[in-house]
Amino acid sequence: MGIVAETSQNGDTSLCSEKKFTVPQPPSIEEFGIVKPISRGAFGKVYLARRKNNSKLFAVKVVKKADMINKNMVQQVQAERDALALSKSPFIVHLYYSLQSANNIYLVMEYLIGGDVKSLLHIYGYFDEEMAVKYISEVAMALDYLHRHGIIHRDLKPDNMLISNKGHIKLTDFGLSKVTLKRELCMMDILTTPSMAKPKRDYSRTPGQVLSLISSLGFNTPAGGRTQGSLNQQTEGMRGNASTPLLMKKRESLVKGNKLMISCPEASLSSPSIPVKCLTPNLLKCRTQFATSSTSSQSRICLSSLESECGSPRWENCSQDAEAPPYFNSSRVKDSSSEQARSKKPTGSSASQNLKRLEFAFSPIVDRRTGKKAGFQDETGELSDTPLATLNAKGVIRKCLYENKAQEKPKDFDKTGQGELGKFTSSPDSPPWLANGSVAPIQFNDEEKTEKMGVKRNYDLVEKSPEQELLQDKKTNTDYKRGCAITDYPVSQSTGLTMEINSLFLSELRNSANKYASDRKSEDKYISAPRTLEKLDSGNPVAKNLLCELDDNCERDGEVSSTSEGEDRKERLNQDSSSTGMSVTENQIDRDLSHVDKSIKELSFEESQSENSEEITPDNKGIPFMAENDERVQSKYEPNTSILPDSLQNVLASPAPASAMTNPRRKPMVAFRSYNSPINVSNVSEPSKISMNSADKIHFSLECTGSFPMAVTPAQNKVQGLIETPYRTPKSVRRGGIQVDHERILGTPDYLAPELLLRKSHGPAVDWWALGVCLFEFLTGIPPFNDETPSQVFQNILNRDIPWPEEEEEVLSVNAQSAIEILLTIDPTKRAGLKDLKAHPLFHGMEWEELQYQPMSFIPQPDDETDTTYFEARNNAQHLKVSGFSL
């Protein structure tokens, strides 16, 4: 009964007590070979790769971990992998494997040979109505599938629509997507992934694929440094190994196995670990020097092809990759020791053995199929977080670096780096090769920064996240050293690329909004004179948003007593800000915010002390605090926006309480930091205790910030006697407003929805807005809000300025224009969805359940299976240069 029987030589039969099973394992990136690069996006590059065992073609998206850490995009990479892993739809690109190495993440997806719709649009100019309707229908089905499973794409555009070999559309590039799954993927999520009504074998996944898709993505890269909690433990472990034999013995007992001892004692006495990113050129030189990467053993002892090509600074020409981040374009310190030692060092067996050990320790993705421990794996079956997490790898790499230091000759830096060299060589903790002056001269470039190998960078050279860069004052173009000249405004093509929207772009919108309010001043008594901020393009965005939104709400918040008082208010504001550096608005806050009992300044720390506080019961403690669901409160706080144009009524209208909320008590002077002073964005707090009676006041406070708190805890009924000064502004509130989840605006300017620009809470409606933009672009050839600069694009979006074609041969049909109108609705609650599109006359006669089988207008005709010419039109139009390499 399931027991294997074996027959011996004498014919007797015996029962075998063991049965061997093949344990499924995810594949290694070594099993894929690069064919050619395909395209490049904002956060990664895509390559055409071939599986070595079955010659099947895949599209491999390579994302650098250090790049994602520097851009603060770690969570977005995780969201992209999860969104693709959870999706099984004929209109969404299929993800096969999710692999990773020490420096990169590899998403192995299906290869769609037809290219992207953006390239096809550049070739066609524009699509006819039938072709555009078919494409929009398939994309609408994909969006509906994603939204039903809690996924918002948030970067929908023709660039992210791929064409299959039969001409059908599939969505890709979920790098900015939002997944409601608040945990890591498990096997049940992959196995029970919702699919079509009749699942096909095309959507089934092998055990190796499932294991790779549920694996945790580790961003503890050697280049970026280990940032997780295991850093201290691993550091202590390495220090223990390098200190005394007693601690080394203790570590051996913990891992329950004997480790290879280091043959050179000087390696254990060296300085702390060196970043792997700087060791890659040395490794490549050593490979060339000793010629150990033969054809028979290349896949076993050498770096993987993808790892060496994508991780090495030598792989790409920096001049060809001008749009890459400065971190990867910076020049490296040349290792002259390897160049000098080529003619001096013998290529003996010991050197070759050391190189093998170095490469074996450096690459964590080799020797996956054998029973040996790859990447110095211990007997517990768990790989270390990084290849340098063990003492063996650390010692081997240092040994290779220190071997020839006695033969090196001191050389001087150029004048640009001479000061830095003296600073590090004079330190007692500096590495021996710096102490001996054995650093090769660097050919300094005035437009690049230099990163020293093995030396911790200064603060000025540390890569900063986008939020940290916004905290600094704006610099001029001459302050930045770039590989190419930059203009005052980006070119028109840049509005079609994915980017992070800075406050610099949004500040121009506020200026135009203030100008518009000034023009309407004489017509409406509820709008006061606009107040222009001092420096909208510098300082912290949180403080600017707080002040701008307070100004916008207060200007529509009631009748100003007199014009002279407003002018007097401005004079005092300018005097205080120029003398003390603080924007003190005493009378302004007194008059404009005197009606608000609890504004955003006290929301984090203070309670409303009302005599008739409502008792919290199990019946009412689940009531949401959003007063927009209450018709009584909504009618009470309805603002007067009838004087505004129809296109701006829904955008600029804010349900801020007007003069109906009266409070006879005057508030004290409130001080805000200056616009130019840096503010710590992370030093904010969530609301802790809010009474149930202040629901209406909470509503106004939340509208000031354009978001809602993550959690609101009602206050206890007992009176706390520690609150003696309920109107004191807490210190942390002066540093900015409540931190919201979606503070950054990421996306392509032409396709952003108005609620994203206004930093309001958003949902799946942002994808339907982008679909309306795509429909207009399909029929006309250009996006409806396209302009010269991103700020002008944003202004067109908020104004809903759509340039409808007027000529006879280019005019859109009534049904097409109506479909665009219902998709490009400012109010996200009234925006059309799949149900509305199915009932629209433009899509009349469309067989929605059989879309994947309908004949398409365009069917790719490639020269061969590796033809990538359908991707070139978009790359050339957007000036994207895909780096080449030698196979």
Curated annotation (Swiss-Prot):
Gene Ontology molecular-function annotations: ATP binding; protein phosphatase 2A binding; protein serine kinase activity; protein serine/threonine kinase activity
A single cellular component GO annotation: nucleoplasm
Outcome, altering residue 41 to S: Abolishes serine/threonine-protein kinase activity and ability to regulate mitosis
InterPro entries attached to this UniProt entry: AGC-kinase_C, Kinase-like_dom_sf, MASTL_STKc, Prot_kinase_dom, Ser/Thr_kinase_AS, Ser_Thr_kinase_AGC
Phosphoserine, modified sites: 363, 465, 654, 677
Enzyme nomenclature, EC number: 2.7.11.1
Catalyzed reactions per annotation: L-seryl-[protein] + ATP = O-phospho-L-seryl-[protein] + ADP + H(+); L-threonyl-[protein] + ATP = O-phospho-L-threonyl-[protein] + ADP + H(+)
Region (Disordered): 321-353, 410-435, 556-624
Alphabetical keyword list: ATP-binding, Cell cycle, Cell division, Cytoplasm, Cytoskeleton, DNA damage, Kinase, Mitosis, Nucleotide-binding, Nucleus, Phosphoprotein, Serine/threonine-protein kinase, Transferase
PANTHER family, per the entry: SERINE/THREONINE-PROTEIN KINASE (PTHR24356), SERINE_THREONINE-PROTEIN KINASE GREATWALL (PTHR24356:SF1)
Listed name of the protein: Serine/threonine-protein kinase greatwall
Species this chain originates from: Xenopus laevis (African clawed frog)
